[in-house]
Structure formats: C-alpha cells, structure tokens
Amino acid sequence: MPPDELVRRWSTGDGVARARDVLERLAKGTALDGLGLATVDGLVDLRGLPAGGLDAHGGEVVGADLSHAWFAHAHLTGVRWRRCRFDRANLSAAVLVGGGLTECTMRRADLREAVVAGGIWSSVHLAGITSNHLSADHTTFTGTTFPALRHVEFTACAFVDCRFTGRLAEVRFLGRGQPAPMLLRDVTFASSDFRYAEFDGMDFDNVEFPDDGALIVVPRSFKAVAERAGMISLRRRDDVGKQLRRFLSEHSLRPGLSATAGWAVSRRDLAPDVAELAASTLHEAQQQLRAEGVIP
C-alpha cells in the first residue's frame, strides 16, 4: 500500500474511530487488544498512524508496525516498545523520556531535533535515519546499529556492543563531569570519516577504530597522556608546537575529565603540521607512561 494511502485510511470511514481508539490507549498506556486491528507480517498494523503531538505515558507496545507513522512533536514518557517497526516514521522534534526500544527498527526514520532521555535502546537498527540535531541524554544503547550521523549530541550516554557504520559529522560524545565514567564498551566504528567528532570524557573499553591513519586515538588516560605530550612538544617552540599545546590544554584541562577517559580526533580537524606533531607526541607519551607503569 502506498504511503499516502497508509496515512489516508485513518481519516476516512471506520479509520477515524479506530485512530481515535488507538491514540487514546497509547496516551493512557493501555494495551491495544480488542480493537480489531489487522496484522501485517505478524505485526499489528499501525502503519501511517497520525500520532503527531501525542502525549503518552507508560505502557508497553509489542509487535506493531508503525512504518510511515507520524509522531512529530509527540511526548512519549515511560513507553516501552518491543519488536516494533518505525521504518520511515516521522519522529521529528519528538521527546522520548524513559522507557525504551527493544528489537525495533527505525530505518530511514526522521529523528531531526528529537530528544531521547533516560531510556534503554536495545537491538535497535537505525539505518538511514535523518539525525540533524538529535540529542540523547543519560540513555543506554546496547546492540544498536548507527548509520552516518550529523549534528548529534550524546550526553552522559553509555554504549555497549554497538556499531557505527558511517560518517560522523559534528557528533559529540560527552561524558565529562558525571558521577561515574561514561562508557563505550565493545563498540566498533567502521568508518574513519570523522569531521569535528568529539569524544569528551568517555571511557573506551574494547573500542575499535579503523587502522588507516585518519584518526589519532588515545584509548585510555587521555588526561595524563595529554599532559606528557605537552611536555614532549616543548622541543618545538614554533607556532606548530604552541598550537598543539593550546589544543591539548583545551581538551584535557577543563574540569570534570575522568583519569581513565579515552579520546580521539580526526587528523582532518587539525592543520597538517599540528596533526603530525600531535600523532607523534601522543604516541611517544603513551610509550613513556606505559614504561613507567602509569598507564596499562
């Protein structure tokens, strides 16, 4: 059924009353049983549902197809979604607080300016999402696959067994100043195409980056490594050395950085001479600190 028809069917005939019933139950967090809803591929057929601006609290939705549904500006608090499809759904400017998604897909969904806070996303596939100005706060992602991302901010989020498959442009992983270190564990970055990606205060535990020389990575103890690299760089008293020391200070000396946090930057984000000096001094600093037993 074409997308326009999926949407239109909720505004004609019996679809009007059916949409009202579905939205009322979603808002109250009650089950959708007994509404006579059809199924598609074994999932409750909610494709094209007009749920823009929905204010929903609690409840669990299991096994629903919400492809092409409209959740723009919705506020979903404590709602748990399991085995649901949100493929090509519009969740722009939606706010998802608490709750979470498990074994769901959001292929080519629109998540522009959406806010995710305090939930758990497990085994979620986000291939092809539109992510401009998406923000996530205190959210745990496990087994989740991320596509290329642009203008995304993750604050105090944890990532376990996740995979980032594409370019990261102005994507920020912010963990500084949290009571416990924020974690990237068993995470793979398949692409080194980073442009102003920022890792600030995130602990790296078995994190894989492409080994193609495009990135400068300090897998642990960046604060100590940056301090030692700054001392090593004093051999260079020229503008390149000064630029590097300034850059390292800006990234390592702000309050709240844990002693164990890792760090990474794209060489393209630095002037070529500064990038070359950064790579060599940070490498030498790590070697010295390992030899001294300061870092593992």
Can you describe what each PLM-predicted range is?
Residues 4-12, 16-236:
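Tandem repeat scaffolds
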